[in-house]
Amino acid sequence: MDSGKEGEAPAATSSPESRRTRSNGKVKAFADAAPPSATVVSTKATPLPRGGWKKGVAILDFIIRLGAIGSALGAAAIMGNSEQILPFFTQFFQFHAQWDDFPMFQFFVFANGAAGGFLILSLPFSIVCIVRPYTVGPRLLLVILDILMMALVMAAASSAAAVVYLAHNGSQDANWIAICQQFTDFCQVTSEAVVASFVAAFLLICLIVVSSVALKRG
């Protein structure tokens, strides 16, 4: 019986070397294990998609463009229909006033008609700017042409306003008498046309400002 117990003792007892080997293996296993991935929390705000405000500006451009079309073509149509014939006349002279009797009014009709035609042709480019807010080429072209049309309409409205002023008030220094006391309807119609033309010029200025804002890099 003693010999059996002596034979089982070495199996139950582990040597210090084997314990060190097992402990070294555990340490190596922990060292070889991949460290847990650290969760990185970003404090940077997610950028919101830009371009929505540019699309809104393009829609505003389209609406203003429609108003400018109505004002320019309305001014040309009103001035083109300005005519008055007084009910009295002499044997050699008939009192008649018409828009084409004045070169400034002729230029007025041409300028406002040309501006209205340009604004109609510019509508497709304005729609392209709505569909593609970041496009630069059509918007830059519209800015350049809007500036030219604004200068043309402003010149026509200013020259016509000078004639209308003289028709209402005359000029004592130049011995020009006022004719609006006789041609009341003619002066009223031409005054309305000049006001409509100045409205068109103001809307063209608004278009230039809106297009410049749309071209700004956000």
Curated annotation (Swiss-Prot):
Topological region Cytoplasmic: 1-58, 128-139, 214-218
Which segments does the topology annotation call Extracellular? 80-106, 161-192
Question: What are the recorded Gene Ontology BP terms?
Answer: cell wall modification; cell-cell junction assembly
Q: What is its main location?
A: membrane
The membrane-spanning stretches of this chain are: 59-79, 107-127, 140-160, 193-213
**What segment(s) does the record annotate as region Disordered?**
1-26
Q: How does it sit in the membrane?
A: Multi-pass membrane protein
Q: Which subcellular locations apply to this protein?
A: Cell membrane
Query: Keyword set for this entry?
Result: Cell membrane, Cell wall biogenesis/degradation, Glycoprotein, Membrane, Transmembrane, Transmembrane helix
Pfam families hit by this protein = CASP_dom
Task: Identify the glycosylated residues.
Answer: N169
What's in the GO CC field?
A: Casparian strip; plasma membrane
Q: Which NCBIfam families match?
A: A_tha_TIGR01569
What is known about its subunit structure?
Answer: Homodimer and heterodimers.
Q: What does this protein do?
A: Regulates membrane-cell wall junctions and localized cell wall deposition. Required for establishment of the Casparian strip membrane domain (CSD) and the subsequent formation of Casparian strips, a cell wall modification of the root endodermis that determines an apoplastic barrier between the intraorganismal apoplasm and the extraorganismal apoplasm and prevents lateral diffusion.
Which PANTHER family does the record cross-reference, listed alphabetically?
A: CASP-LIKE PROTEIN, CASP-LIKE PROTEIN 1U1
Query: What family does this chain come from, according to its entry?
Result: Belongs to the Casparian strip membrane proteins (CASP) family.
* Full protein name: Casparian strip membrane protein 5
Species: Glycine max
